Amino acid sequence: MKKIFQIALFSMFLLWNGITMAQTFTNPKLEKLTTIKRTWGAGAQQDWAIYGDSLYRFYDKFAFIDIINVKDLHNIKKEYSIFTLLNDVAVHCNDVDFSKIFYKNDDPLPLVYVSQRGDSCRTNVYRITKTGPLYTVQLVQTIHFKDAEMTTTNVDETGQYLWIYSNGPYGRSYSKVKIPALDNKNVSLSVVHDAVKRVRITISGVGQGATVKGEFIYHLHGYKNQGTLAIVDLSTGTEIQKIDLVNLGFKGEPESIAFRGNDLLIGDHGNFYRLYDAAATSINTTALPNRTIINTDYNLAGQPVSKDYKGVVICEGKKIVRK
């Protein structure tokens, strides 16, 4: 209990001082949760995204979306399969992410951003609605990345930006662009001129599914028997951890990845895994470089206090008693 309290206090200190934490894995372990076979006729499983207690599993060609209940990770079950009526070989679904944008206030789900086949350099934006037991999927926008090469996209945690993973024109990189308004059905963005931030990376291997948490991206790479997970600091492009999934028992092609709380769910073609940390805590702290830390003292309520304050204070990450 004492160690948990110390970790909580240190985490609060980092947040107060503008330092972002990355969830890394000191002693990574992989637990197989279940197998749910693909929907008949659906094609190959690609990425998935989680909203609430439901996981949405996407397939290549975007013909089907499976809705899978993940409220209890040891009782995962498929509830429904949506037939999209939008079968398109270009929409590979290599990367999918829910945004925080609702097309209409009473929609059951926010808009979902779906990467097309990498060489098409486009991302589709879909609206999913429900009438009774029936779901309807509507294409509301296509974003064209006119000067990029082999793109996938992820929505950042604020819901205001997209991170574009691209093999060019700056080598392999992530570029951050403002999510465009929905006024036009077709929008062109430039990773050269429209990016508000860009970081170059040195990750090797073919990119698969990815997900963003805080200022870090968790990106799967490789084909069957080659799977790795790269955790990259999006402020610098630094790969802060690389996990060999094959050594942990993952033999398939790593396609799907999403967080549910602190549980990182990874999938291949039908199998569900949980990546977790066998150490005391699964939260390690990674400070962003070149951040100025102001040495302010706080009371236990998180309020700044002066040097004359008497009582228990948090000073430079440590709990002390001033008399």
Regions found by a protein language model. Name each.
Residues D194-L234:
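Loop/turn-rich, solvent-exposed surfaces of beta-rich toroidal or solenoidal domains
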Residues W40-Y51, V89-L109, D147-Q160, V206-K213, ...:
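Structural signature of eukaryotic scaffold interfaces centered on beta-propeller domains
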Residues G252-A279:
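Blade-level signature of beta-propeller repeat domains, shared across WD40, Kelch, NHL, RCC1
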Residues T238-R260:
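Conserved blade-ending motifs and adjacent loop-strand segments that build the rim/top face
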Residues I36-G41, I82-V89, Q141-D147, K197-S204, ...:
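Surface loop/turn motifs at the tips and blade-to-blade linkers of beta-strand repeat domains
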Residues F62-N69, D119-T129, P169-P180, N225-V232, ...:
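Structural motif
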Residues T34-A63:
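Beta-strand-rich domains and repeat architectures in extracellular enzymes and scaffolds
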Residues A279-A301:
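Residue-level detector of functionally pivotal "anchor" positions at catalytic/ligand-binding pockets or at interdomain
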